[in-house]
């Protein structure tokens, strides 16, 4: 049995290999696996040149992914996002800066979209515990602080939580 119970498939127009290279470069354990290419078969359906990249298998942050060049039929949206949990502000800054580079977009409350349109959340360790604290006043202050941010500032979130 596989050590990974499932693989996340990301449907791109034609940027699968570029996306896999970016995502694997972000994480110390990132690596690209098998690359499958389109053949002559099925051209009437896929309309891709023979030999062009069809799928790229890769691993990033311990997760298995397949990036598919499936064409413009489907676009990414915020209904699905990938969450990166960070221990330090330097980690948050690293992921945030890399993922918003070259056309990525900052969104609100720790969310961003990378240049491919994939949604990410870059959050500090302990964030969900602060938001779900039994101390409702502390959780409320944390939420108020969160709504003022795009990229999270750990010190400001902790200060808001502490009151």
What do these predicted ranges mean?
Residues 12, 16, 26, 60-64, ...:
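Vicinal oxygen chelate
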Residues 127-141:
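A short, polar/charged loop-to-alpha-helix boundary motif
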Residues 18, 94, 138-141:
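Extracytoplasmic/secreted proteins, especially bacterial periplasmic and envelope-associated proteins
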Residues 6-8:
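Hydrophobic faces of well-ordered beta-strands that scaffold small-molecule active sites
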Residues 10-62:
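Core segments of cupin and vicinal oxygen chelate
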Residues 40-45, 66-68, 129-130:
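A short, acidic/glycine-rich surface segment
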Residues 139-163:
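Acidic/histidine-enriched, glycine/proline-rich intrinsically disordered or flexible terminal extensions
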